Amino acid sequence: VYPLDVPRALEKLSSIRDDLVFWSTGAQAQQLIESDQVDMAILWSGRAAAAVKNGAPFQPMWNQWMPEADTIAVPKGAKNPEAAFALINYYLGADQQAKLTELTSYSPVNVESKPNVDSVLKQFDTSTPERMKDRFPIDLGYWAEHHDELVTAYSEWLAG
């Protein structure tokens, strides 16, 4: 997959551009599938699960799904880094991750976490071994190194 063939990707997007619907917020993406305005969507699993709970006739497709990277950090020079790290450890604990999943529909990052979720949320769990093997590989180093050129190419395509 890497290095990305950006011209080829943008050429493919150009071939279907008239059929694309762009969204700017997670709420808007969820509304698009709830109101049956789109046949397929890329959106966060928690938003998709909420839409299905609200009656949207959608199901997840896990073939080369794209995980989203997130970070939690303690800034250099923080007044109380020990407390900050303690908060992060608490947040990432199995019990707290289970509660977070139950409240938000987003999968836990702690593999020891065992949230109590219904069948709809289980469909959208991104942390199962089967889902992990089917994901699209994200090379954060590549994205960091090529960030400016990738953003420029995509922005120019959007504007054109």
Give the location of each predicted region.
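Ligand-binding pocket segment of bilobal, Venus flytrap-like solute-binding proteins
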Residues: 1-61
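Soluble non-cytosolic domains of exported or imported proteins
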Residues: 3-7, 24, 78-82, 94, ...
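Conserved C-terminal helix/tail region of periplasmic/extracytoplasmic solute-binding proteins
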Residues: 31, 130-160
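Sec/Tat-exported extracytoplasmic proteins
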Residues: 16-20, 24, 37, 52, ...
